[in-house]
Amino acid sequence: MKAIIVLLMVVTSNADRICTGITSSNSPHVVQTATQGEVNVTGVIPLTTTPTKSHFANLKGTKTRGKLCPKCLNCTDLDVALARPKCTGTIPSAKASILHEVKPVTSGCFPIMHDRTKIRQLPNLLRGYEHIRLSTHNVINAETAPGGPYKIGTSGSCPNVTNGNGFFATMAWAVPKNDNNKTATNPLTVEIPYICTEGEDQITVWGFHSDNEAQMVKLYGDSKPQKFTSSANGVTTHYVSQIGGFPNQAEDGGLPQSGRIVVDYMVQKSGKTGTITYQRGILLPQKVWCASGRSKVIKGSLPLIGERDCLHEKYGGLNKSKPYYTGEHAKAIGNCPIWVKTPLKLANGTKYRPPAKLLKER
């Protein structure tokens, strides 16, 4: 059998070119590679975004806490933390919390010497727990505490729900009940039991009252500075009261007060007892906070509007449109993009190849 060979001849002119291999049009996309530096590619997918500032929002898939007690109207977070009259209510559980007051504003009710203690940290301490509740029972009987019997002091600046005189539910203002025990006393000690459910932290609020010399004698029978100490969970704190030198001060339109109170708290771990050593003017602990779980806390602002994937301290609420972001680096919680210094691109095409030239026919 004879083989038949068919020859295909292509006749070209001097101006003709034949392009072979992969070709593409010119590309504006440039990517930075580890081995070849800048490389032109036929296509890229941007992986980064630069957010714009927005309002804070609820975190998708979880409850987000703004104010400690949303239904406690006209109450600061410190009012709620101290259980001021008319400022007690349910604190919703939350796995994420907005720290909207870096330095919580003052409580009303009675003039507090905030700068002597860490009391302004109390709302933010509570905010860091997922579950928070105020005990239904008092931790001790204040009327029969050492140095008593006591009557429980109230203030016209702290109206209760019936608009009578009241005081913070977390503390009892222990005033000697009769003239027989309105005298100076050596330091007295009371044990503060653990009354929360096992596994919860117990946050016990306490403090002391001081006034000018005349009022100290009238209330307590002693005008000298008084000493106070709290101890719990390996932390011991000492105070000496200041006598007099206070200008009259009214809180929230209440009655002017010549005295001041210093308020502090101690954290008692599960099953652990605390102690308070005191003299005259003690504000004995009553209802305590029982707290458990952890809530992720981020600095932000209120109100919370809508829902977002991520909460970012600098940008507010974000939806995750890209896996990475550029711009300001700050704390973020939720389903958040990762911060990178420079934009990232993913090459989804081929390396740009210029058209190949056909050798001219000789």
Curated annotation (Swiss-Prot):
A Gene Ontology cellular-component term: membrane
Signal peptide positions on this chain: 1-15
Domain of life (superkingdom): Viruses
Glycan-linked positions: 40, 74, 160, 181, 319, 348
Membrane topology: Single-pass type I membrane protein
Gene3D superfamilies in alphabetical order: 3.90.209.20, Hemagglutinin Chain A, Domain 2
Primary residence: virion
Keyword Signal assigned: yes
Biological-process GO terms, alphabetical: fusion of virus membrane with host endosome membrane; fusion of virus membrane with host plasma membrane; symbiont entry into host cell; virion attachment to host cell
Transmembrane regions: none
Processing after translation: In natural infection, inactive HA is matured into HA1 and HA2 outside the cell by one or more trypsin-like, arginine-specific endoprotease secreted by the bronchial epithelial cells. One identified protease that may be involved in this process is secreted in lungs by club cells.
Molecular-function annotations in GO: host cell surface receptor binding
Subcellular location(s) per record: Virion membrane; Host apical cell membrane
Record key words, sorted: Disulfide bond, Fusion of virus membrane with host endosomal membrane, Fusion of virus membrane with host membrane, Glycoprotein, Hemagglutinin, Host cell membrane, Host membrane, Host-virus interaction, Lipoprotein, Membrane, Palmitate, Signal, Transmembrane, Viral attachment to host cell, Viral envelope protein, Viral penetration into host cytoplasm, Virion, Virus entry into host cell
SUPFAM superfamilies, per the entry: Viral protein domain
Database matches in InterPro entries: Capsid_hemagglutn (IPR008980), Hemagglutn_HA1_a/b_dom_sf (IPR013828), Hemagglutn_influenz_A/B (IPR001364)
Pfam families: Hemagglutinin (PF00509)
Misc. comment: Major glycoprotein, comprises over 80% of the envelope proteins present in virus particle. The extent of infection into host organism is determined by HA. Influenza viruses bud from the apical surface of polarized epithelial cells (e.g. bronchial epithelial cells) into lumen of lungs and are therefore usually pneumotropic. The reason is that HA is cleaved by tryptase clara which is restricted to lungs. However, HAs of H5 and H7 pantropic avian viruses subtypes can be cleaved by furin and subtilisin-type enzymes, allowing the virus to grow in other organs than lungs.
Family from the record: Belongs to the influenza viruses hemagglutinin family.
Function: Binds to sialic acid-containing receptors on the cell surface, bringing about the attachment of the virus particle to the cell. Plays a major role in the determination of host range restriction and virulence. Class I viral fusion protein. Responsible for penetration of the virus into the cell cytoplasm by mediating the fusion of the membrane of the endocytosed virus particle with the endosomal membrane. Low pH in endosomes induce an irreversible conformational change in HA2, releasing the fusion hydrophobic peptide. Several trimers are required to form a competent fusion pore.
Subunit field text: Homotrimer of disulfide-linked HA1-HA2.
Protein name as catalogued: Hemagglutinin
Taxon lineage: Viruses, Riboviria, Orthornavirae, Negarnaviricota, Polyploviricotina
